[in-house]
């Protein structure tokens, strides 16, 4: 079920919200939580019901394993059990996400012809696996004692963040499900949440889905792009990805706020970054936080000398790359960001101050080149697009074949301008329910209805991860 689908907007969200607050209105706290959990699992099962078994089994096993970890006194036994828990979660992720990739590459390497059926990737497995990694690791440290099972299940399955984040941390979310003040309907949270949700909806259906037309046309013919088309294609995808994923995150934050649950901000105008380190403070913030806390710091962070620090950066972003998908393109994308951060760190040691505008341009160009690997379906296609972008792949003077519709070029320009406006969570801080904001919400709703009727609804890009 998509946030931008008729089923979600007309039935699922209003029914779930209404029943939840009615139950809490009459002091039925636990039935309210059970209702929200059941609805969240129904939301997940809409895609493929069979994988309910996977997520429910995983929740039960990880909860009780984490609680047991808190109370194992023998350090050696606790460490062994901790490793078993991590490997159990990792093995499930490896099986579903990487088996076909590994078999294909082994066949290529060893000249074998082993054939296995295509394994369907369970929705959101990368996201809820990361959450459980964090929970198990913190349980190993003795930091999750006394967690309630129902609250834990809601932490994992709460539908706004379940499918594609933001990647929430148990320390931030579970106390909110225990807070009595969060159980009652809050007009301020509701109007702010609705406002953020509508802004995210417009980002998705009016901007991201429009730029998808340009990006898909270009990458669908990656080996025959002109110089102009290759740049238009790459920029269109950079805009599409930002508005698609940040739009989803805004809709998730808004939907969470309808239930008085505050989810973390995931984007903070990343294309305004003046260096790559700044970019990762602004782009997919919750993923960056997770990689830092559970990969980079355990490796030693920056505490064990400069050489190991640079190595830790590379390893962290290689993990981040392969987390996104089972393809060499994602590994190369992760390598490019790790390498870029290494270069940035070495540059800082020169004490040479780069003008912000120069840093902004260099960062945008580098990130855009890296996105080519992120989007392309193969390394060969990515290299073909990059060759065209540097004038080596086709007629450098050829006009655009991608912008075939007259409205697409103005849309491209509009999207570039919108990148530099305030984020919906920033706008929400200034939000006060008055006539002006009511008018904004009515206009956003009308625009949303117009686009829902005129443009085919696309899946969110991060559903594939």
Give residue spans per PLM region.
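Membrane-embedded transmembrane alpha-helical bundles that form the catalytic cores
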Residues: 1-415, 429-464
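Membrane-interface capping segments at transmembrane-helix boundaries
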Residues: 422-429
């Amino acid at each position: 079920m998509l946030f931008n689908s008729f089923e979600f907007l007309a039935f699922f969200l209003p029914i779930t919200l209404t029943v939840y607050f009615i139950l809490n209105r009459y002091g039925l706290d636990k039935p309210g939580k059970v209702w929200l959990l059941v609805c969240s699992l129904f939301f997940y099962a809409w895609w493929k019901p069979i994988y309910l078994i996977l997520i429910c089994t995983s929740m039960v096993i990880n909860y009780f394993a984490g609680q047991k970890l808190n109370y194992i006194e023998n350090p050696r036994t606790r460490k062994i059990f901790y490793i078993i828990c991590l490997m159990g979660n990792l093995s499930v992720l490896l099986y579903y996400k990487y088996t076909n990739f590994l078999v294909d590459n082994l066949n290529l390497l060893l000249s074998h012809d082993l054939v296995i059926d295509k394994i369907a990737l369970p929705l959101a497995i990368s996201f809820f696996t990361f959450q459980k990694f964090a929970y198990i690791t913190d349980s190993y440290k003795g930091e999750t004692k006394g967690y309630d099972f129902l609250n834990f299940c809601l932490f994992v399955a709460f539908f706004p963040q379940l499918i594609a984040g933001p990647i929430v941390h148990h320390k931030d979310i579970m106390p909110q499900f225990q807070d009595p003040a969060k159980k009652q309907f809050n007009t301020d949270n509701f109007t702010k949440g609705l406002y953020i949700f509508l802004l995210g909806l417009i980002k998705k259906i009016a901007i991201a889905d429009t730029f998808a037309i340009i990006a898909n046309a270009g990458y669908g013919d990656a080996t025959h792009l002109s110089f102009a088309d290759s740049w238009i294609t790459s920029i269109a995808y950079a805009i599409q990805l930002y508005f698609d994923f940040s739009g989803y995150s805004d809709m998730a934050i808004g939907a969470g706020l309808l239930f008085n649950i505050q989810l973390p901000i995931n984007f903070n105008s990343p294309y305004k970054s003046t260096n790559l380190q700044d970019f990762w403070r602004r782009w997919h913030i919750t993923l960056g936080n997770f990689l830092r806390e559970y990969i980079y710091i355990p490796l030693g962070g920056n505490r064990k000398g400069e050489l190991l620090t640079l190595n830790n950066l590379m390893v962290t972003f290689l993990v981040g790359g392969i987390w996104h998908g089972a393809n060499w393109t994602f590994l190369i994308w992760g390598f490019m960001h790790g390498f870029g951060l290494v270069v940035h760190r070495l540059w800082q040691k020169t004490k040479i101050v780069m003008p912000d505008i120069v840093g902004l341009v260099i960062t945008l160009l580098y990130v855009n080149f890296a996105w080519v690997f992120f989007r392309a379906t193969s390394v060969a296609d990515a290299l073909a697009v990059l060759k065209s972008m540097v004038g080596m792949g086709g007629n450098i003077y050829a006009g655009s074949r991608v912008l075939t519709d007259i409205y697409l070029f103005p849309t491209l320009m509009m999207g570039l301008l919108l990148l530099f406006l305030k984020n919906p969570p920033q706008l929400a801080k200034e939000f006060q329910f008055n006539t002006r904001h009511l008018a904004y919400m009515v206009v956003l709703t009308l625009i949303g209805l117009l686009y829902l009727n005129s443009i085919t609804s696309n899946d969110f890009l991060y559903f594939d991860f």
